[in-house]
Amino acid sequence: MNKYEKIAKGIVVNRIRSSWIEIFKFYNEQTSKEIGTLSTAFVLMTINEKFGTQVTKIAPRMGMEPNSLSRLLKSLEEKELVFKRKDTKDKRKVYICLTENGLKLRNIAAKRLFSLEKSIKDKISTTDLSAFYKVTDTICLLYTSPSPRDH
């Protein structure tokens, strides 16, 4: 292990990033032909299958910037996986709804994601998972304070 690798291994942010990249790559390899990326899977699963989901609620649920989400939604629309529906009572509200094909892919994405989740939980002890959840929750709380000056 070289000096950079030794230093990087001890940096929390790098470990989180590296783990996420490996999970992302693994999931994408498993689903790229059917679904596309993990981001696509998460968007499809965020959308209520019966009523759709208000477009303004999707980005915060996913932790995405609105601009990134807009590009992703446009791509999903072009692939005919989702469509936009305006609220009949309040025209300012726009809902993203799943097409029939979008619903099929949502179900595939959910199965694959829960399969990945199960494989992780099968290999990691409950104690270690609890510690992981505690640490990640604490990290999130550190950076969700109201003022950037608090960091």
Segments predicted by a language model, with ranges:
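Single conserved hydrophobic/aromatic residue that forms the stacking wall/gate
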Residues: 146-151
